[in-house]
Each structure stands twice: as C-alpha cells, then as structure tokens.
Swiss-Prot record:
Protein name: PI-PLC X domain-containing protein 1
GO cellular component, one term: cytoplasm
Gene3D superfamilies: Phosphatidylinositol (PI) phosphodiesterase
Keywords annotated in UniProt: Cytoplasm
Record gene name: Plcxd1
Organism per entry: Mus musculus (Mouse)
Family annotation (SMART domains): PLCXc (SM00148)
Primary localization class, coarse: cytoplasm
MF term (GO), any: phosphoric diester hydrolase activity
Length: 345
C-alpha cells in the first residue's frame, strides 16, 4: 500500500469533517432535566444521531472503540504480567530500572482515562481482565504486558456512573483475556457486572437498535470471552469477534483487514482493530521508540482506510472500529461520521 500524498490526506480529512456535520442532529427531546448537548459534543453522539438511524441494529452502525482501554493507568513500577515471555521476566529481574520504563512505552495504548474516552465518544471498551499473582482473593485488575493498579470493580462503577449522566448512550464492554481467572473468579466478576449495571444490561439475544434500547432503558452490552460463564448468565453475550492483524507495519495490517472484509463480515457485532502490534524482538531492537510514536506515524494510512469504510449489512461492511490513542487525529469523529453513509439521499 502506497503512502498518501499530502493533498490526498487533506481531501480525506475534509470529507470526514463534512460528513460528521451531517450525521448528527440535536434532537427535540431532552436528556433528563437538561437539554440535549449541542451538535458536535461527542459525549452524547448516539442520542444526537439522525432519527433515521435509531432503527438500525447496532451491528450495522459505525461505532468507535478503544483497544486495550485501561492501559492509561500503567506506570514504570507496574508489574510485568506472568503471561509475558520468560526473557522479559529475566530482564525485569536483572535490569528492572531499564526494563520497566521500556515495557511501559510499549504497553500503554491509551492516554485518556475511561471517563475521558466515553466523553470523547468511544462506545466499545476493550477490557483485558486478570487476577494478578499475590493479589487479594477478589481484586481483579487489567493487563497488557503489565498489571494495572486500577481495579475492575471500581472501573465498572465509574462507567455505570457515567451512563447515569448520559441515559441515551450505549456502551459495549468486551471482557477478555482472563489471565489467572478461576471458575469462582468468573462468577465473582459476572456477579459484579450484574450488581453494578443492573437493569442497564441488555440480555443476550438479537442485536438491538437504539430505539429498542431506549424504550427498555438499557445501555450496556457485555461481551464475555469465556463460554462456560456466558452459559450461566443471560446478561452476558458471547465474545465479539476482533479482527487482529498482529502486524508491525501499517500496510500489512490494512491488507489483513481488507482480506477479512473479503471473507464477509460476521452476523453480529464485530471489531476491526486498526492497532499496530509490536513483538519482543522489535521492542529490543528499537529501545528509544514507543507504541505511541509508531501509531502516530501510521495515522495517514489509517485515516484513509477509516474514511473509506462503509457501515451496514453488506458482507464487506464494517461495524466497530477500535484503535490505540483514540484522541489522535480525530479518530472517533471519523468513525462516527461513517454513519452518514447509511442515510437516504
């Protein structure tokens, strides 16, 4: 895939900005006791969608997501996860003052905290959950090469509180990874989800529309990547497919995504991940680089690809598009703007 000419990058960005202005409208209803947010405020973009889109199932809409949502709270003292390679653990023991900072640079995929991501318009949260060794019995955390200090129960509560302030917004929570989780811990986590979100939860079934969710006062779909647990809780949905290219180079990643599109989209909700993936060899050979710098270098090609996508029900349509550093280059706005392509002329 060839790099974009500067003039072409400008045209792509202009198209996305123009479309974004047309897909949102300020509805006549009010949210709670306050008027709906003004146009362009992405904290309430779902409630501001054109009424024509209220009856479109969520898996046919274009929805922005964040990859490895919780990595913003990692720091240099975060512990390396037990699932990481033996070489990384060895380096962590021998030269911890070097290993910690280097690993952190490649573990952090987001700079906005979870509330800021929701305010920015992100509606798919990628929650990699783990039980860290030597942690207390039920203190579940998040993981991406390193363990977070943030606890799962606190984060779910923060999300629920945000939703109470935005009663017509809908979030999709993908609970994944489950490093160190036992059957008892899965039941504990499922219980936390049910207790914290309560009637906000949309039970597993046919993918709903926004109008249906609003009528039922439901705001949360929880995808859970453990089949045994899903079978025990009606409130949990099966794992949402995530197209992961596992590629360091942007052009390789985008070719993978195009190949997946060519094979036909899944029937329900699914994610196209536009996240670059490093490996340990690459990290060791590029000690002064970082995932953020590598991601930002890839933005021109990523932007072109995103703006070319089409939501809907056709085999090559996209649904959720998730990326790293979602605050960069108007990523969220561009994904939301794709919904304009669903509007009748």
């Amino acid at each position: 895939m060839q790099g974009l000419e500067p003039s072409r990058v400008g045209r792509v960005g202009e198209v996305c900005r123009s479309v974004h202005k047309n897909v949102l409208t300020v509805p006549e209803h009010t949210v709670g006791t306050e008027a709906a947010a003004p146009m362009g405020d992405q904290a309430d973009w779902m409630s501001q969608l054109c009424p024509q889109l209220w009856d479109v199932p969520l898996h046919h809409l274009s929805i922005p997501g964040s990859h490895d949502t919780m990595t913003y709270c990692l720091n240099r003292k975060s512990r390396i996860s037990r699932a990481s390679s033996w070489l990384l653990h060895l380096l962590g023991r021998v030269v911890p003052f070097i290993t910690g900072p280097v690993v952190m640079k490649w573990s952090v995929t987001q700079t906005l905290d979870v509330t800021q991501q929701l305010d920015a318009g992100v509606r798919y949260l990628d929650l990699r959950i783990a039980h860290a060794p030597e942690g207390s019995t039920r203190n579940l955390c998040f993981v991406h090469m390193m363990y977070t200090k943030a606890l799962v129960e606190d984060t779910l509560t923060e999300i629920a509180e945000w939703l109470q302030s935005h009663p017509r917004e809908v979030v999709i929570l993908a609970c994944r990874n489950f490093e160190g989780m036992t059957c008892e811990l899965h039941d504990y986590l499922a219980g936390c989800i049910v207790n914290i979100f309560g009637d906000m939860l949309c039970p597993s079934g046919e993918v709903p529309t926004l109008r249906q969710l609003w009528a039922r006062e439901q705001q949360v779909i929880v995808s859970y990547e453990d089949e045994a647990t899903v079978s025990r809780y009606d409130q949990l949905w099966p794992a949402i497919p995530y197209w992961w290219g596992n590629a360091v180079k942007t052009d390789v990643l985008l070719r993978f995504l195009e190949t997946m599109k060519g094979q036909g989209r899944p029937d329900g909700l699914f994610v196209a991940g536009i996240n670059i993936t490093e490996n340990l060899c690459y990290i060791l050979l590029h000690p002064v680089d970082s995932l953020e710098e590598m991601t930002r270098r890839s933005l021109p090609l990523m932007t072109e690809w995103v703006c070319a996508q089409q939501p809907g029900q056709s085999p090559q349509c996209t649904n959720i598009i998730a990326g790293d550093f979602v605050d960069a280059d108007g990523f969220v706005s561009k994904v939301i703007s794709l919904n304009c392509k669903l509007l009748s002329p």
